[in-house]
């Protein structure tokens, strides 16, 4: 067997299948395009569904790929096992109605065993097959596989409800008795026992039947066009070919682990407690690729998955003694490992690093206190002999310290404790009720309290300086005022400060505090307004600080200027929106960060591409006009007379600041700005979207980021032009339109065929009328694509007097969907479905005339249908 790098394995895979007439399908973006059924691309075949379902006909029916994929259903197992990953790479070869079993098996065996290719020892390979699939068994024998290496497995049949299905044959590599301490042998395969001896490296799915849950498999009809769908995990192949004990000891992960060793000062022990190394290595791969593909950490959907992965990795970093931000430092290593096939990680390195670092910093503001609090809670449970972490304590970790509930649960379980989910939900509801009665101030300080409310010392923000000397007025540590502090995190108030407190959509400044010797004694990580308006500096204390002492306060000037570019551009954007789409387009929220600006505004429809172009052009014209920016302090009425617009979310006192950009823009604003519009450099809108009824959002970049955005657009256009074989960039649109027109025609034809098929199916279903207890009923299993189709059946049924009651069941994917409709007062559909649903391990409910339920046990569908007569 050849010892190859992961890059060599991937390339050899693609080269082999190219030699067999396959075209190479590039790896798709991890974020699915036009497929709302998927959160992530999760397999090699996921991007080829358009070919397998016939909506698009490939130019070449033979396809091979190496597809980056993400699966997050087993996050908790990552690091605990040898082979669980969130982000992985699936190698595949596919035949769309072309070659079938013979070639798939023969070529697969050739790739694995030929000295020209992988050169696996034949005696180390074992194959499983579906017992009734004698053709696959015979084909393996014809390839030279010993009968003793072929294991029949009843589960080797791929099907998801009705539709294409077929047997599959899996290929395993035997790593020997060293990985089988109890010497169980082939029973590990035959009985599907979890083990580290026989490693599944490849699965070949022979899609040859049209599954029909109403009949035995032996009666499934053959598909007119048979397909091949295979998947081989690159990480597993690399582990086998590199002689690694686990996937993590391969060249795909070890360079990352080595970097973690450097950062932590700890050594990775393949035979010891190495879970944290594995978690970090796995999660930073997923984060790097997902963020590079456009997904960002957030509070829902994909964003929540990324935030959860990042926070889990950070916590495992803490376990290794890494207490500073570190994950972003691993991004270049990920990029270097994958550069040969996925150059985009290094190309987008700066962006990915910044997103990861910012998210780390956000989490780090409270993680120390949160971890300490959790440790105290668990110690208290142990002392009291309890085994469950209470809901109110979970909520405090979640609400005050920012810990994800899943992370709390995982940490508690690691320590041998359970968590009170219901208690957490109750505490969450109480908090939501409180929020309705009073606004709770957010920010890194957590929540308002008496200590903060008691700050009455005066403090003044100085706009026009990046550094100044000031007296320290207030120190708060552990929620108590104190005269001095020498470590940990603290909140500080100075007599005056150059640090801008987060307000009006502009993020807070960061920077340093120095003593009279020029030594840095604290790092400012956040600034929020205290209840009485003073800038409240959240700092990491590095050396002694004491009230009444003078310190030098220095902001991060480069960061401030980047934020000012975006904030000033926001004013220009606001004015341009008024001019292009109307005065109604008023600000509904904004965020001016270092890397981008986000502007929310009221508007009743999506902004057209032409309007966006005009807006972008107008903003840039004002930048190039080099308009002088002036600020004036005056009263509100005078400001209004000057034509100033008030900003969303701001409360104005007697004296307000008016920011004027030439004669183009006049706004009330308490933020910081540039001196001249030309300093912005360039403005580029990167996204426009709806975020709620009547509210739109524009995300834009300025300066260097704007230039990068334009360059990326140009690169993308060049790639599109090359893909559609446009002779020049200007011809790309016409080429794409032609392809789109062709696709639309095919889709229309497909929809018409589906309509006809559904109508025919409905006629057959409604013919089978039964009667029980004087009630006429129809009970049938139907083949539909989604639950909505069941409702369509019911709507058609209502139009005529077919029966009094209709019961339909459909196996859709791994779920069972049940519908009950009733036209008679004697049968309550909602009550009836409550009796039927448990039969298929489900539950549901509804109205007297219509009810639906979902279940998970498709094997009990026939039993459910038989029970209808008893429940009417």
From Swiss-Prot:
What reaction does this enzyme carry out catalytically? Answer: tRNA(Ala) + L-alanine + ATP = L-alanyl-tRNA(Ala) + AMP + diphosphate
Q: Which domain of life is it from?
A: Bacteria
Q: Which coenzyme or cofactor does it need?
A: Zn(2+)
Cofactor binding mode and count: Binds 1 zinc ion per subunit.
Pfam families reported in the protein's UniProt record: DHHA1, tRNA-synt_2c, tRNA_SAD
SMART domains in the record? tRNA_SAD
Q: What's an example of a GO molecular-function annotation for this chain?
A: catalytic activity, acting on a protein
Q: What is its main location?
A: cytoplasm
Enzyme superclass (EC): ligase
For this UniProt record, give its keywords in alphabetical order, as a comma-separated list. Aminoacyl-tRNA synthetase, ATP-binding, Cytoplasm, Ligase, Metal-binding, Nucleotide-binding, Protein biosynthesis, RNA-binding, tRNA-binding, Zinc
Recorded hits in PROSITE patterns, A to Z, give:
AA_TRNA_LIGASE_II_ALA
Q: Which GO terms describe its cellular component?
A: cytosol
Q: Where does Zn(2+) bind?
A: 567, 571, 669, 673
Query: Does this entry carry the keyword rRNA-binding?
Result: no
Q: What is its EC number?
A: 6.1.1.7
GO aspect biological process, one term: alanyl-tRNA aminoacylation
Where is this protein found? Cytoplasm
Query: Which family, according to UniProt?
Result: Belongs to the class-II aminoacyl-tRNA synthetase family.
Function of the protein: Catalyzes the attachment of alanine to tRNA(Ala) in a two-step reaction: alanine is first activated by ATP to form Ala-AMP and then transferred to the acceptor end of tRNA(Ala). Also edits incorrectly charged Ser-tRNA(Ala) and Gly-tRNA(Ala) via its editing domain.
HAMAP family per the UniProt record, alphabetical: Ala_tRNA_synth_B
Q: Return the domain comment text from this UniProt entry.
A: Consists of three domains; the N-terminal catalytic domain, the editing domain and the C-terminal C-Ala domain. The editing domain removes incorrectly charged amino acids, while the C-Ala domain, along with tRNA(Ala), serves as a bridge to cooperatively bring together the editing and aminoacylation centers thus stimulating deacylation of misacylated tRNAs.
- Give the protein's recorded name: Alanine--tRNA ligase
Gene name of the encoded protein: alaS
């Amino acid at each position: 067997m050849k010892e190859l790098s992961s890059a060599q394995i991937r390339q050899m895979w693609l080269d082999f299948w190219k030699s067999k007439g396959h075209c190479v399908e590039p790896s798709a973006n991890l974020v699915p395009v036009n497929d709302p059924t998927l959160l992530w691309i999760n397999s090699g075949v996921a991007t080829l569904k358009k070919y397998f379902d016939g909506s698009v006909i490939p130019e070449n029916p033979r396809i091979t790929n190496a597809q980056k994929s993400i699966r997050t259903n087993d996050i908790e197992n990552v690091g605990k096992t040898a082979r669980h990953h969130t982000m992985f790479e699936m190698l595949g070869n596919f035949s769309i109605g072309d070659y079938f079993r013979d070639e798939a098996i023969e070529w697969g065996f050739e790739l694995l065993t030929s000295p020209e290719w992988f050169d696996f020892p034949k005696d180390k390979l074992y194959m499983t097959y579906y017992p009734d699939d004698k053709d696959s068994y015979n084909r393996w024998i014809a390839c030279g596989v010993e009968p003793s290496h072929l294991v029949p497995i009843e589960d080797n049949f791929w099907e998801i409800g009705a539709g294409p299905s077929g047997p599959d044959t899996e290929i395993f590599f035997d790593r020997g008795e060293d990985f089988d301490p109890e010497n169980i042998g082939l029973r590990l395969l035959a009985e599907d026992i979890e083990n580290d001896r026989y490693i599944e490296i490849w699965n070949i799915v022979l899609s040859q039947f049209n599954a029909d849950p109403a009949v035995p498999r032996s009666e499934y009809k053959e598909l007119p066009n048979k397909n091949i769908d295979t998947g081989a995990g690159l990480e597993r192949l690399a582990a086998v070919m590199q002689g690694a004990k686990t996937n993590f000891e391969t060249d795909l992960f070890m360079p990352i682990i080595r970097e973690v060793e450097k950062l932590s000062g700890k050594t990775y022990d393949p035979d010891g407690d190495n879970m944290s190394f594995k978690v970090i290595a796995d999660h930073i791969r997923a984060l790097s690729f997902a963020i590079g593909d456009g997904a960002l950490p957030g509070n829902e959907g994909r964003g929540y998955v990324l935030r959860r992965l990042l926070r889990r990795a950070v916590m495992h970093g803490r376990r290794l003694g890494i207490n500073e931000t570190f994950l972003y430092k691993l991004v270049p290593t990920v990029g270097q490992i994958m550069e040969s096939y996925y150059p985009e990680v290094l190309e987008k390195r700066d962006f990915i690093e910044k997103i990861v670092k910012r998210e780390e910093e956000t989490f780090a503001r409270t993680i120390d206190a949160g971890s300490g609090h959790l440790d105290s809670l668990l110690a208290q449970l142990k002392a009291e002999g309890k085994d469950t972490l209470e809901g109110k304590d979970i909520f405090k970790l979640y609400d005050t310290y920012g810990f994800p509930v899943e992370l709390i649960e995982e940490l508690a379980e690691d320590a041998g404790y359970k968590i009170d989910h219901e208690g957490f939900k109750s505490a969450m509801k109480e908090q939501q009720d409180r929020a309705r009665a009073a606004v709770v101030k957010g920010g890194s300080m957590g929540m308002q309290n008496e200590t903060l409310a008691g700050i009455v010392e005066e403090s003044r923000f100085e706009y026009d300086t990046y550094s100044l000397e000031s007296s320290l007025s207030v120190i708060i540590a552990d929620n108590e005022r104190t005269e001095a502090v020498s470590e940990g995190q603290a909140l500080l108030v100075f007599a005056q400060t150059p640090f801008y407190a987060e307000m009006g959509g502009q993020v807070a400044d960061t920077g340093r505090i120095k003593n009279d010797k020029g030594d840095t004694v604290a790092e400012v990580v956040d600034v929020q307004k205290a209840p009485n308006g003073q800038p409240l500096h959240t700092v990491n204390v590095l050396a002694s600080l004491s009230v009444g002492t003078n310190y030098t306060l220095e902001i991060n000037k480069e960061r401030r200027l980047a934020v000012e570019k975006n904030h000033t551009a926001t004013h220009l954007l606001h004015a341009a929106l008024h001019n292009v789409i109307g005065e109604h387009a008023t600000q509904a929220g904004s965020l001016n960060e270092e890397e981008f600006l986000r502007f929310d505004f009221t508007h009743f429809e999506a902004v057209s591409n032409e309007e966006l172009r005009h807006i972008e052009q107008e903003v840039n014209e004002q930048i190039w006009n080099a308009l002088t920016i002036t600020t004036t302090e005056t009263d509100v009425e005078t400001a209004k007379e000057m034509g100033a617009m008030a900003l969303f979310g701001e409360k104005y006192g007697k004296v307000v600041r008016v920011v004027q950009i030439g004669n183009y823009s006049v706004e009330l604003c308490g933020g910081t700005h540039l001196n001249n519009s030309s300093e912005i450099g360039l403005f580029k809108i990167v996204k426009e979207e709806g975020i709620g009824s009547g509210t739109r959002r524009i995300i834009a970049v300025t300066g260097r980021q704007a230039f990068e955005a334009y360059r990326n657009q140009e690169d993308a256009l060049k790639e599109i032009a090359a893909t559609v074989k446009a002779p020049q960039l200007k011809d790309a649109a016409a080429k794409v339109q032609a392809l789109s027109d062709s696709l639309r025609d095919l889709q229309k034809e497909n929809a018409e065929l589906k309509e006809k098929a559904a109508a025919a199916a409905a006629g057959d279903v409604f013919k089978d009328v039964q009667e029980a207890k004087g009630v006429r009923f129809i009970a049938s299993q139907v083949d539909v694509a989604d639950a909505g189709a069941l409702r369509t059946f019911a709507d058609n049924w209502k139009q005529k007097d077919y029966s009094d009651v209709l019961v339909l069941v459909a196996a859709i994917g791994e779920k069972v969907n049940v519908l009950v409709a009733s036209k008679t007062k004697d049968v309550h559909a909602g009550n009836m479905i409550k009796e039927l649903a448990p039969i298929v391990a489900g539950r549901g409910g509804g109205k007297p005339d219509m009810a639906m339920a979902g279940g998970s046990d498709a094997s009990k569908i026939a039993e459910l249908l038989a029970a209808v007569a008893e429940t009417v």
